[in-house]
Amino acid sequence: KGLHWRSRLNLAISENKKAGLRAHKSNTVIEIDKCMIALNEINKSDIFTKNWDNENLKISCSSTNEINVSQFEKSILGPDKLTENVDKNTYTISPKSFWQSHINAPGLLLQQVMKEANIQQDEIVCDLYGGVGLFTLPVSKLIGKNGQVHLIEMNDTCIEDANNMFEHIENIYIHHGTVEQKLGGVKNIDTIILDPPRNGVSKQVINHMIEKKPNTIIYVSCNPSTLARDSKVLLENKYSLSNIVGLDLFLSLIHI
């Protein structure tokens, strides 16, 4: 337990051109021949035995065991796109796009969000801070041709991936920009799913959500303190808290 779960790694390169990790609060690179929290597929590769130029490596391993190595946001080894299978959904994403680092996290999050949201036919759903559309794709299958799911994301690479994957799905609408900029333009929202960064959502976004009066809000958070702060505002505006579920997606770390 707590080992061999991480699918994304940032590695440093030593003076001997070997991959390793930086010592705590130091620029010193400690060479390693394996990483105990990395997926076994990463440790079985030649990443820790090869010689590398430059200073850093980003390693990404998909659920289909594809491995990409990137430097300075450019792929230098492996496929340029990774295939991720989550339940019955398939995603094709760039290693630069955000994806959960725990290999099982996308599936656990998806199952819990879909359970709590209880999406129905013909609903209008917003997926805020939606990344490449982890929640958008399964929602689109539940709402039918008369429903709508609106993915709002500001990251260019995530939006490019989402456009490539969903361009032929007629009930998915992709909005490139901040939630502050785009949420106001979506009408008659039934359900909001949001997965913001650790600092939570802005007052403007909270106010937009309250003004839209969705029946259901599913808040995915990696920071209990900002979740509590934002939930307090919603509770003060006629919403009630029906359920809280904790998922340990960062094993051996303080985060939840």
Named regions from a protein language model:
Residues T216-C222, L227:
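Conserved beta-strand signature within the Rossmann-like core of class I S-adenosyl-L-methionine
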Residues N237:
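Conserved active-site and SAM-binding loop architecture
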Residues D230-L234:
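Short alpha-helix
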Residues K1-L194, N199-V205, K213:
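Accessory RNA-recognition modules of RNA-modification enzymes
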Residues P224, D248-L251:
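A short, acidic, flexible beta-alpha connecting loop/helix-capping segment that sits on the rim
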Residues L241-L249:
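Conserved S-adenosyl-L-methionine
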Residues I254-I256:
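Conserved small/polar residues in nucleotide/adenosyl-binding loops
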